[in-house]
Design a protein with these regions (language model features):
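Catalytic-site microenvironment of enzymes
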Residues: 1-237
Length: 237
């Protein structure tokens, strides 16, 4: 009996060690793509309410840079930093070259990867050119859709928002819950969406077009992500 107990203990410790040695997976989702996708999809499992897959994003008011290009540029920088920190990274796209896949498909990539965090990268737009700042969105509590990821998503949003604002220095617009984001409602893993800044604000548009600020954004996202995962952010630079 004692031998069986010891064997079970050894096997249990070995399994725990294997789990501890497995790097966490982060799915990075650079928002949008080359072309919008005006087909529709249900906003959540079993819902009769539908939204378009992808409206196409915004564009730099001064630079003319499409949001999809900015999102991807920051995402690729973030991938390098997270990999350096020992995190397994899955990207929803690595080029800006096609019609957007939509938000259910993006969430399913994160679900299949069993992501520790599904990090969606966007930039904002407004009819008011004075609108500025950084904010982070996360799923509202909805029974049957997000109740299993709500608390972790909210915690991730708080940590990543703080790190991103500190890195970019843009005004802090805080956190926002959303009930109608398809990519949130179909996600089975913690999920947040960051809005780096406003591409319709001349100052923020110019800054986000530079390598310096794109690197700052990636570093802020890296630090926030690693802190959420309980890891040291030193590899983020």
């Amino acid at each position: 009996m004692r031998r069986l107990v010891l064997l079970a203990l050894v096997v249990g410790l070995g399994a725990a060690a294997a789990r501890a040695g497995t790097p966490p997976t982060v799915v990075i989702d650079p928002g949008h793509d080359l072309r919008a996708n005006l087909a529709t999809e249900p906003i959540g499992p079993g819902s009769s309410v539908r939204k378009i897959l992808d409206g196409g994003g915004t564009r730099g008011v001064v630079t003319g840079i499409p949001e999809a290009d900015l999102n991807l540029a920051v995402a690729l920088r973030l991938r390098r930093l997270l990999r350096r920190a020992g995190v397994r990274v899955v990207m929803t796209r690595t080029t800006t070259s096609g019609t957007s896949m939509g938000n259910i498909a993006r969430a399913e990539i994160a679900n299949r990867a069993h992501a520790a965090l599904f990090l969606r990268i966007h930039a904002d737009g407004s009819a008011d050119p004075s609108a500025d700042g950084t904010h982070t969105l996360y799923p509202a509590l909805q029974k049957g859709w997000t109740d299993d990821i709500y608390a972790r998503s909210r915690r991730a949003a708080r940590i990543v928002q703080a790190a991103l604002v500190r890195a970019l220095g843009f005004p802090d617009r805080g956190l926002q819950e959303h009930t109608d984001f398809t990519g949130f409602n179909w996600s089975n893993v913690p999920v947040i969406l960051v809005e780096l800044g406003f591409m319709t604000n001349p100052t923020e548009d110019r800054l986000l077009a530079t390598d310096r600020y794109r690197q700052r954004a990636a570093q802020g996202l890296c630090r926030g992500t690693l802190r959420y995962l309980g890891r040291s952010p030193t590899a983020c630079g």
